């Protein structure tokens, strides 16, 4: 092959197509790998696990002591005062409504307070971090889902639901979320339905009218049979008297024949 290359370089003729060089390079394949990975014997695994090196833990510097325990946080006087106010509000009022405390102007807020105060309904605002712990430990815990964000309470000693709903309709941007009336938790729709009920005086009047009607009907039913029996007996006695009078009159008109002499 080297001679052919040298001849080409000297300008000679290229080798013939059938001519093969005397030296040829042959590329052999790689040798087979006989040491493939195999699963380690379980005894060797145990031995390796036992003899595994475990580095020691670094020593703790004695100056790196744990922090001292923090003293229990004492409640401030303001928190205790607010909790007392919350307890008094939920104890002394029969109606407690929850509304979302939206951003109202000073004029709108003053007008709303005035309209509610005419019906003896008052607005109370308490921080959530004081109000929520009280609700969690009281019978009003089901009101907790309503207290999201900033809220305000509409409270009244009497259940003035109808007046409250009428006032809130004039303030559509103050949403009503729910409330509690006479220890009964109601949703927003429940409060609206409660406001549609008639007043207590109307219900008492309807009850008295119904009872009076029932009493009159009962009295009529109790007296109807004796009166009818009395009228029938009077008619019977009258007919008997008329029959006796007719018999006596006939006897007078037609006296009996005298008995013949023997």
Swiss-Prot record:
Keyword Protease on entry: no
Compartments where located: Mitochondrion
Alphabetical keyword list: Mitochondrion, Ribonucleoprotein, Ribosomal protein, Transit peptide
GO biological process: mitochondrial translation; translation
GO MF terms, alphabetically ordered: structural constituent of ribosome
Gene Ontology cellular component terms for the protein in this record: mitochondrial inner membrane; mitochondrial large ribosomal subunit; mitochondrion; nucleoplasm; ribonucleoprotein complex
Signal peptide (from-to): none
SS bond partners: none
Transit peptide, start-end: 1-28
Region annotation (Disordered) ranges: 243-262
InterPro entries reported in the protein's UniProt record: Ribosomal_uL10-like_sf, Ribosomal_uL10_bac_type
SUPFAM superfamilies in alphabetical order: Ribosomal protein L10-like
Assembly notes: Component of the mitochondrial ribosome large subunit (39S) which comprises a 16S rRNA and about 50 distinct proteins.
PANTHER family: 39S RIBOSOMAL PROTEIN L10, MITOCHONDRIAL
Family in the record: Belongs to the universal ribosomal protein uL10 family.
Name of the protein this chain belongs to: Large ribosomal subunit protein uL10m
Recorded name of the encoding gene: Mrpl10
């Amino acid at each position: 092959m080297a001679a052919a290359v040298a001849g080409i370089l000297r300008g000679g003729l290229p080798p013939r197509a059938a001519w093969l060089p005397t030296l040829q390079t042959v590329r052999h394949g790689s040798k087979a790998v006989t040491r493939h990975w195999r699963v380690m014997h379980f005894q060797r695994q145990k031995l390796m696990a036992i003899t595994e090196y475990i580095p020691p833990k670094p020593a703790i510097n004695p100056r790196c002591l744990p922090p001292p325990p923090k003293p229990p946080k004492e409640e401030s006087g303001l928190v205790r005062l607010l909790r007392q106010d919350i307890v008094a509000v939920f104890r002394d009022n029969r109606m407690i409504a929850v509304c979302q405390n939206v951003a109202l102007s000073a004029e709108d807020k003053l007008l709303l307070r005035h309209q509610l105060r005419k019906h003896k309904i008052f607005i109370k605002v308490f921080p959530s971090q004081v109000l929520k712990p009280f609700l969690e430990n009281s019978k009003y815990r089901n009101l907790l889902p309503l207290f999201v964000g900033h809220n305000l309470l509409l409270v009244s000693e009497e259940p003035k639901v109808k007046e409250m709903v009428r006032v809130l309709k004039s303030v559509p941007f103050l949403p009503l979320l729910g409330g509690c009336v006479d220890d009964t938790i109601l949703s927003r729709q429940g409060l609206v339905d409660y406001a549609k009920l008639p007043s207590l005086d109307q219900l008492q009047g309807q009850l008295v009218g119904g009872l009076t009607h029932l009493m009159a009907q009962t009295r009529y039913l109790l007296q109807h049979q004796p009166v009818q029996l009395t009228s029938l007996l009077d008619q019977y006695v009258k007919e008997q008297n008329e029959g006796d009078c007719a018999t006596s009159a006939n006897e007078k008109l037609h006296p009996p024949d005298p008995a013949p002499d023997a």
